[in-house]
């Protein structure tokens, strides 16, 4: 993938850039793998906003992605196409299996149209192949990793994501995350060899707010510039600081707090935060 910079013909185009889509081999998706996707605008079933800054955006169709790949062990597949997916930053690869079935997967880096891919414990260690962590050599870079055996890939699915398998200790495999965190994962969990493609996505300059609106992202407004009816920090004469400790729109404290999770016992080393503990 490469990035194409726009000429400064307008203020919105100045400095902006876009992917050149050089790796895309097909413009139309596989119809049998499409499902309708209805925009919720950040609302729940009662019509209340549960996630702010969402709404609008271009109409999309959801592409069904195979995040498990455990029912195709031993069945070879050929990469038929590399396609664009509006629902994620990574590209997707359309696989044609030897038994006639077609499926989408996250497109790994350096996987091209016509390549052969397989899954299973005996699969070769090459980009795109999917196998359990206990069958992958230490030091290998992987992506699309399960957190529970058979649960489907949850970790490292976005563009350019890469996780390194640093050690194996009994029933666990130790993974170094992009954040620098090292954590234990069940060695029976599956992962795909290689890193996710489209790594230049992070370097795209979106240029103007309108391009964010096309993606369904609405503006983020600070609470201190709202009215009292809209936010606990709102109101006051002139420019104010909010007059209280930071809270969210519902009045619950924001910022420093404890957010321990049940999986903390599996974390070997914390991620780099830059904070003194």
From Swiss-Prot:
Q: Which Pfam families match?
A: Ribosomal_L2, Ribosomal_L2_C
Protein name as catalogued: Large ribosomal subunit protein uL2
Q: Where is the composition biased (Basic and acidic residues)?
A: 23-33, 251-267
UniProt-listed PANTHER family: LARGE RIBOSOMAL SUBUNIT PROTEIN UL2M, RIBOSOMAL PROTEIN L2
Q: Provide the GO MF annotations for this entry.
A: rRNA binding; structural constituent of ribosome; transferase activity
State the similarity comment.
Belongs to the universal ribosomal protein uL2 family.
Origin superkingdom = Bacteria
- Name the job this protein performs: One of the primary rRNA binding proteins. Required for association of the 30S and 50S subunits to form the 70S ribosome, for tRNA binding and peptide bond formation. It has been suggested to have peptidyltransferase activity; this is somewhat controversial. Makes several contacts with the 16S rRNA in the 70S ribosome.
**Keywords in alphabetical order:** Ribonucleoprotein, Ribosomal protein, RNA-binding, rRNA-binding
Listed under subunit, the entry gives:
Part of the 50S ribosomal subunit. Forms a bridge to the 30S subunit in the 70S ribosome.
Query: One GO CC annotation, please?
Result: large ribosomal subunit
Q: Where is this region: Disordered?
A: 1-58, 223-277
- What processes in GO biological process is this protein linked to? cytoplasmic translation
Provide ranges: composition bias, Basic residues.
37-58, 268-277
Q: Which SMART domains match?
A: Ribosomal_L2, Ribosomal_L2_C
């Amino acid at each position: 993938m490469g990035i194409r910079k726009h000429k400064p013909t307008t203020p919105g185009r100045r400095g902006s850039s876009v992917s050149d889509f050089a790796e895309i081999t097909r413009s139309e998706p596989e119809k049998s793998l499409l499902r309708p996707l209805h925009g919720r605008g950040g609302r729940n079933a009662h019509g209340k906003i549960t996630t702010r800054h969402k709404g609008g955006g271009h109409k999309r169709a959801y592409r069904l992605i195979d995040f498990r790949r455990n029912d195709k062990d031993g069945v070879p597949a050929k990469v038929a196409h590399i396609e664009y997916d509006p629902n994620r930053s990574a590209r997707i690869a359309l696989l044609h299996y030897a038994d006639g079935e077609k499926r989408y997967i996250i497109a790994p880096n350096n996987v091209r149209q016509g390549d052969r891919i397989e899954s299973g414990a005996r699969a070769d260690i090459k980009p795109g192949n999917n196998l359990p962590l206990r069958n992958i050599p230490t030091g290998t870079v992987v992506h699309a990793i399960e957190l529970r055996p058979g649960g489907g890939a949850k970790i490292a699915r976005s563009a350019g994501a890469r996780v390194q398998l640093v050690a194996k200790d009994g029933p666990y495999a130790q993974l170094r995350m992009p954040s620098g965190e090292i954590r234990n994962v069940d060695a029976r969990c599956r992962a795909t060899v290689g890193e996710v493609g489209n790594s230049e996505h992070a370097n795209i300059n979106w240029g103007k707010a309108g391009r964010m609106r096309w993606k369904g992202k609405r503006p983020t407004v600070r609470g201190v510039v709202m009215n009292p009816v809209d936010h606990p920090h709102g109101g006051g004469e002139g420019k104010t600081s909010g007059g209280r400790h930071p809270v969210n729109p519902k009045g619950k404290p924001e910022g420093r707090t404890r957010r321990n999770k049940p999986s903390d016992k599996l974390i070997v080393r914390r991620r780099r935060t830059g904070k003194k503990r």
